[in-house]
């Protein structure tokens, strides 16, 4: 029998407590007990990786790659310098979960990174924090100082042979630096542009050394897994989607915000947690994982569950868990214009298909909104999107194509109306 899924604060467990970001608060809820246990009992990296594999934890930044498998690529036995990086560079519209983990529970990120460093043999770590959030960067620096003072960072941690230094790195606000190799280039002081792969960061990362990059929420999940066991984490979710996930719900809801829930919860219940659709309006469509995941119509979304397989079944994906709610007053043409402008502005310009294609997409949609569109523009948008997708070094080209293709697929009638009449078919959007 299925167990009802519910809110479960795991990465955000200190939120709501007094002085949540302090090390004293974290220690009061059992913080740093996982790394203490590892160092005291000298648990092998292989044992820990196996536990993470059992947990079913998948990368929480968007790709959803199995964490245990990714960590196994960087062997603890390899000698020399290695790096571990927390990717807190969330810059896609609708994403704001990592900011709250840093704000309320920075020490759980630190402990997760320490465990990762122990497993993979890394001696230096960075938390790459998005350039447009300043207070959280300062807060994380304070947390590092607290951890050092308590003997959790530096040399011979907790009297063991384990050495690990951690640094906060403030990014420059570029969305592209959320891509792991562009992030590495930025840390090295270069222009943030993706690298060709292979070689992958696990063999050639920061300064040519083996490097592991994982999302903030991924690292913050690790201490709980070590303390409670991989099977317990897996059981929180559903098969192929173990654990909890923070969903950032925004758009036309009464109570927008971050909601950490057990994976497998019906979307309808998540929407209820967010207060339902605002102003008594009807739900029209949802972007379930951020703009780089396909749009889903209301009737399909209301029967879906919030997990990897549940969203895949309705033609979308979990992504970073950025749930954008659109009510029946939303003009899909104008919404797509905003999203296409974002991808156009954030293209790093390295790859011709993305550099030129995102500009084409935005300009064509803009002329439709300006009342100058032609029916042929719909075929042009599809054609350009398909020519951008799969032809770039990183996935930004694919991401830019996704909303275009899914918006037109589900709401082509709105685009045709806009082209024929030079205005939106949604009442009030032309005022």
Give the residues covered by each predicted segment:
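Conserved phosphate/anionic-ligand binding catalytic regions in large, soluble enzymes, centered on
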Residues: 52-74, 171-185, 189-191, 344-356, ...
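Gly-rich Lys/Arg/Thr-decorated short loops/hinges at beta-loop-alpha junctions or inter-strand turns
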Residues: 26-33, 86-98, 201-207, 248-253
């Amino acid at each position: 029998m299925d167990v009802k899924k519910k809110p479960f604060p795991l990465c955000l467990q200190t939120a709501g407590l007094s002085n949540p970001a302090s090390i004293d608060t974290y220690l009061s809820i059992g913080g740093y007990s996982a790394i203490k246990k590892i160092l005291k009992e000298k648990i092998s990296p292989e044992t820990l990786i196996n536990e993470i594999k059992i947990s079913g934890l998948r990368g929480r930044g968007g790709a959803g790659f199995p964490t245990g498998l990714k960590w196994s690529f960087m062997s603890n036995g390899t000698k020399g310098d290695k790096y571990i990086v927390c990717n807190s560079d969330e810059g896609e519209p609708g994403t704001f979960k990592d900011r709250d983990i840093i704000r309320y529970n920075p020490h759980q990120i630190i402990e997760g990174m320490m465990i990762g460093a122990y497993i993979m043999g890394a001696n230096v770590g960075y938390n790459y924090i998005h350039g447009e959030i300043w207070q959280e960067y300062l807060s994380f620096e304070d947390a590092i100082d607290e951890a050092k003072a308590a003997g959790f960072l530096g040399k011979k941690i907790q009297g063991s042979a384990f050495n690990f230094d951690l640094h906060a790195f403030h990014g420059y606000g570029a969305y592209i630096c959320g891509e792991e190799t562009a992030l590495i280039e930025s840390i090295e002081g270069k222009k943030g542009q993706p690298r060709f792969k292979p070689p992958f960061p696990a063999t050639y990362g920061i300064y040519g050394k083996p490097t592991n990059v994982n999302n903030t929420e991924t690292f913050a999940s690790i201490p709980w897994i070590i303390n409670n066991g991989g099977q317990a984490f897996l059981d929180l979710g559903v098969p192929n989607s173990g654990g909890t996930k923070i969903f950032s719900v925004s758009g036309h809801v009464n109570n927008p915000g971050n909601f950490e829930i057990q994976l497998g919860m019906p979307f309808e219940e998540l929407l209820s947690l967010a207060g339902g659709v605002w102003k008594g309006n009807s739900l029209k469509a949802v972007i379930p994982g951020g703009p780089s995941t396909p749009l889903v119509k209301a009737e399909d979304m209301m029967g879906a569950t919030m997990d990897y397989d549940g969203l895949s079944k309705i033609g979308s994906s979990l992504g970073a868990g950025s749930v954008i709610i659109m009510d029946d007053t939303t003009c899909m043409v104008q919404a797509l214009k905003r999203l296409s402008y974002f991808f156009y502005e954030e293209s790093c310009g390295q790859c011709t298909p993305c550099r030129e294609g995102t500009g084409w997409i935005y300009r064509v949609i803009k002329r439709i909104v300006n009342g100058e569109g032609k029916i042929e523009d719909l075929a042009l948008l599809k054609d350009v999107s398909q020519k951008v997708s799969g032809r770039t070094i990183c996935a930004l080209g694919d991401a830019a194509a996704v909303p275009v293709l899914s918006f037109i697929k589900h709401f082509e009638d709105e685009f045709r109306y806009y082209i024929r009449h030079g205005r939106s078919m949604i009442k009030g959007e032309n005022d």
